[in-house]
């Protein structure tokens, strides 16, 4: 089966049909050949099964898998590259380290699979990205859960994979350990040119890490597309959760050292956000997340108040939220999408309707790495 991507354009084509007695997976996905693609869905939706198909660990009734021009599976041609010959890294919920080896020996084990001439990630780069240089002499038994997972990710990177699979790598960690490891995952996103398929049922993780999103329900892909487009679709479940948010990419456009306020120019040209942060070079692209719960609406421009960011918006549509007392409102701020979660009472008091002009008051903005 030929590649479906335009000449010179890399990508991933993953088509799998898997039949179990009580579950079936039937997906046909065309994904970016770089960056992070998140597979999102509830337990039992088929996320891990899809990952196992990519790794060659699940029996596929009919399938095709092309990773940036390298075909690993083609049922029609009776071609199936065995797992140990697929250039992939796999990170599980809990890092499976060799307990009798120190961290350095664990990392070198990952490197042994790759001839020196084919290594795309070296030891210094992997330990630097994951911040584990000071752990090399430690034994796994002396590591925290977050440290173990960072070592496991570094070992996967040292196999110089053409594809990195991550199956809920933060699921086994407590809140503090998740906060510890997320910045390192963001660095991988920014600094490595390896496509990552990231399984999660956490909207917050997806918003922080992903570029592309696939929503799975009962073994079927109900939506697939750029993260920013899918996060604001009110017909999809992610926009209905308590963690509903949007991810906005803008450019650094000024810094006030007296108040440590960074200004971010949004894509539309007129809208800007300000938030407390260190200085950034003018023009540097930055990603921020804005949660729907942190956005309130007013019909008149607020003149006095402590909220820094007040943007002119247009109401696009509304839908009931997961909590029946609330509604979700999709907004446009000069080309920048936003979500607001407000009470039904506020909607009725303001008499909001699609097409209306309003003012969005943004109480918090979180900068992503």
From Swiss-Prot:
Keyword terms: ATP-binding, Cell inner membrane, Cell membrane, Membrane, Molybdenum, Nucleotide-binding, Translocase, Transport
State the Gene3D superfamilies in the record. Answer: 2.40.50.100, P-loop containing nucleotide triphosphate hydrolases (3.40.50.300)
Keyword flag Chaperone: no
What GO CC terms are in its UniProt record? Answer: plasma membrane
- Coarsely, its chief localization is membrane
Give every Mop domain span.
304-369
Which SMART domains does the record associate with it?
A: AAA
Q: InterPro entries, from UniProt? A: AAA+_ATPase, ABC_transporter-like_ATP-bd, ABC_transporter-like_CS, Mo/tungstate-bd_C_term_dom, ModC_ABC_ATP-bd, Molybdenum_import_ModC, Mop_domain, P-loop_NTPase
**Would you say which domain of life the source belongs to?**
Bacteria
ABC transporter domain residues are: 7-243
Q: Which residues bind ATP?
A: 41-48
Recorded E.C. number(s)? 7.3.2.5
Citing just one GO molecular function, the answer is: ABC-type molybdate transporter activity
Which parts of the chain are coiled coil? none
Membrane topology term: Peripheral membrane protein
Q: Does the keyword Chaperone apply?
A: no
Spell out the Pfam families in the cross-references. Answer: ABC_tran, TOBE
Its function? Part of the ABC transporter complex ModABC involved in molybdenum import. Responsible for energy coupling to the transport system.
Can you tell me which family this protein belongs to? Belongs to the ABC transporter superfamily. Molybdate importer (TC 3.A.1.8) family.
Q: How does it assemble?
A: The complex is composed of two ATP-binding proteins (ModC), two transmembrane proteins (ModB) and a solute-binding protein (ModA).
Name listed for the protein in its UniProt record: Molybdenum import ATP-binding protein ModC
Task: Please report the organism this UniProt entry assigns to the protein.
Answer: Bordetella parapertussis (strain 12822 / ATCC BAA-587 / NCTC 13253)
Q: What is the lineage of its organism?
A: Bacteria, Pseudomonadati, Pseudomonadota, Betaproteobacteria, Burkholderiales
């Amino acid at each position: 089966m030929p590649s479906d991507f335009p000449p010179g354009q890399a990508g991933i084509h993953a088509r799998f049909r898997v039949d179990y007695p009580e579950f079936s997976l039937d997906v046909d996905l065309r994904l970016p050949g770089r960056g992070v693609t998140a597979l999102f869905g509830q337990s039992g939706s088929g996320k891990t099964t899809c990952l196992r198909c990519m790794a060659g660990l699940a029996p596929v009734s009919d399938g095709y898998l092309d990773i940036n021009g390298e075909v690993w599976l083609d049922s029609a041609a009776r071609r199936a590259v065995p797992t140990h010959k697929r250039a992939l890294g796999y990170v599980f919920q809990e890092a499976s380290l060799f307990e009798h080896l120190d961290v350095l020996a664990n990392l070198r084990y990952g490197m042994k699979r790759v001839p020196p001439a084919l290594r795309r990630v070296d030891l210094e780069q992997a330990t630097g990205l994951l911040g584990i240089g000071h752990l090399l002499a430690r034994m796994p038994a002396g590591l925290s859960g977050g440290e173990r997972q960072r070592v496991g990710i570094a070992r996967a990177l040292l196999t110089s994979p053409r594809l990195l699979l991550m199956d809920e790598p933060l699921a086994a960690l407590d809140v503090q350990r998740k906060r510890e490891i997320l910045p390192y995952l963001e660095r991988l996103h920014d600094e490595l040119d390896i496509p990552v398929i990231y399984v999660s049922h956490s909207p917050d993780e997806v918003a922080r890490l992903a570029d592309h999103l696939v929503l799975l329900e009962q073994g079927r892909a109900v939506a697939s597309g750029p993260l920013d487009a899918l996060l604001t679709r009110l017909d999809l479940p992610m926009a209905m959760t308590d963690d509903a948010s949007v991810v906005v990419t803008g450019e650094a456009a000024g810094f006030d050292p007296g108040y440590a306020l960074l200004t971010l120019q949004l894509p539309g040209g007129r809208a800007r956000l300000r938030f407390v942060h260190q200085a950034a070079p003018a023009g540097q692209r930055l990603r921020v997340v804005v949660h729907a719960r942190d956005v309130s609406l007013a019909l008149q421009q607020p003149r006095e108040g402590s909220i820094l960011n007040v943007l002119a918006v247009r109401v696009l549509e509304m839908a009931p939220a997961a909590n029946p007392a609330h509604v979700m409102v999709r907004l446009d701020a000069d080309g920048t999408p936003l979500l607001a979660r407000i009470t039904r009472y506020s909607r009725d008091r303001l008499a909001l309707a699609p097409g209306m002009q309003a003012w969005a008051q943004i109480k918090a903005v979180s900068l992503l790495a």
